[in-house]
């Protein structure tokens, strides 16, 4: 028997079997039908608070679906760039919202009129073009402000970098009697520029913004500043620069320079010193600083207990 005949036989039998199945009907007396809704005006009333009323010029007070051309504000004009430059961000947002809302109203009226085959909508389009000009000028004003901010930030960064370079030179070359004064300045500098709190605590570490990209930059600056000062005063010290990223920079932030140099040498000798990937830096610093602080707290608590005894 061919494959075709098998398929035909199967199909025929399935139809036959389907026909011989008895039809089942439920008890129709148990089916309850809902009474038909009588057409009334109340059934077509729309809530006065319905959000789609925003697409009508007078909201829920609107009486007609499409305004006449004479009802449009044809004498209006678009906002000028000079006027918009004097507005705050909040005012620009309000103007943009009102402009967009009016454009939506006009668009609804034009689309509805065209679908009904109604007449000329040139006046509607003229008003819409004025609104489009206002929106374009708002975008231009916002772009001008963004560019101004970026230029100011770039200038400020240049000034900050110049100050940091100058402070580094003075710190490295300061006299012995000036070290304490420069150390206090460094504490203020790291807080003002890099946001590194001099009273860093375990509670502050729980805040996600405590250790950020700016903190990492400050850590690098402080570590290199301290090690260069130490090497200038102790040229016989055998220590190679540059430091290999946060892994070698952190000891100079947490300890005295001599202790930090010893720790970095141990890291290098053991092969544990490596350059971290960007995604590893902040979690590493947070965990390492937290571990160091907990260790200091434990040591401090132990010493207090010993003194009491």
From Swiss-Prot:
This protein's UniProt keywords: Mitochondrion, Ribonucleoprotein, Ribosomal protein, Transit peptide
Function field: Component of the mitochondrial ribosome (mitoribosome), a dedicated translation machinery responsible for the synthesis of mitochondrial genome-encoded proteins, including at least some of the essential transmembrane subunits of the mitochondrial respiratory chain. The mitoribosomes are attached to the mitochondrial inner membrane and translation products are cotranslationally integrated into the membrane.
Keyword Heme set for record: no
One annotated Gene Ontology cellular component of this protein: mitochondrial large ribosomal subunit
Family to which this protein belongs: Belongs to the universal ribosomal protein uL29 family.
Localization of this protein: Mitochondrion
InterPro entries: MRP-L47_sf, Ribosomal_uL29_mit
PANTHER family in the cross-refs: LARGE RIBOSOMAL SUBUNIT PROTEIN UL29M, RIBOSOMAL PROTEIN L47, MITOCHONDRIAL-RELATED
Organism name: Candida albicans (strain SC5314 / ATCC MYA-2876) (Yeast)
GO molecular function, one term: structural constituent of ribosome
The keyword Coiled coil appears for this protein: no
Protein name stated in the entry: Large ribosomal subunit protein uL29m
Gene3D superfamilies from the UniProt entry: 6.10.140.1190, 6.10.330.20
Subunit composition and interactions: Component of the mitochondrial large ribosomal subunit (mt-LSU).
Superkingdom per UniProt: Eukaryota
A Pfam family hit: MRP-L47
A GO biological-process term: mitochondrial translation
Spans traversing the lipid bilayer: none
